[in-house]
Amino acid sequence: HINQFIEENNFAAVFTISASILPLPDLSRTGYEEIIKRTDFSLTVAKQHGRNCCYIFQEEEYQNFLRIREITNELHSAVNHDFRGFSIIFQPVMDIRQDKLTGAEVLIRFASKKFGPISPAEFIPLLETSGLIIPTGRWFMREAITACRKIRMQIPDFRVNINVSQVQITKSDVITDLISE
């Protein structure tokens, strides 16, 4: 651990160091700009790990960081362009005693332009951390309720189950939104 307490002119400070180790690849293939980006990433991760920490650059972690950043950018773009890339699907709910369809769980899906279908386990946390879950959740509920109304013309007792994020509950008027739909 590197940590130094300095007191001078009635001013006290403790200094710590966060460092990273970045193996330098062949510059002719990588280029200086990419090395600067990887260095910035490495130092950011070292600081996130806490004081007096050294992070050794891992290519796999960097590629995952780039993937997350790209998916997050695509999510922003989709929300700003009428939710292009999002879709809803229905998971049937059956009453097996009567062998009857009683409803469906409505699920949200997202297809990335670059990566194809993205797992909800990956994109929903990104929606939550970016705050995009609020407008996306509103869109999703509108779509689910509209679809349910159409299905009810054929199956009057049809019901839908909608999953709601904790972020939607704590940071939006999700109940009011549902009632207004």
Q: Residue ranges of each PLM-predicted region?
A:
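Alpha-helical scaffold within the catalytic cores of cyclic-nucleotide enzymes
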Residues: H1-F11, R38-D40, F140-K150
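Catalytic core regions of nucleotide second-messenger enzymes
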Residues: I2-A19, K47, G116, R152-F158
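Hydrophobic helix-cap positions at the C-terminus of alpha-helices
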Residues: F5, A46, A78, A147-I151, ...
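Catalytic strand-loop-helix junctions within cyclic-nucleotide turnover domains
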Residues: N10-F11, T16-I35, E60-N64, P92-Q98, ...
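Catalytic core of bacterial c-di-GMP phosphodiesterases, primarily the EAL and HD-GYP domains
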Residues: T16, P23, L27, Q98-E105, ...
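Cyclic nucleotide signaling catalytic output domains
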Residues: S18-L27, E34-H49, Y55-E70, E74, ...
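Flexible, glycine-biased helix-capping/connector loops in cytosolic signal-transduction modules
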Residues: R51-N52, R84
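Active-site core of bacterial EAL-family cyclic-dinucleotide phosphodiesterase domains
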Residues: R67-L126, N163
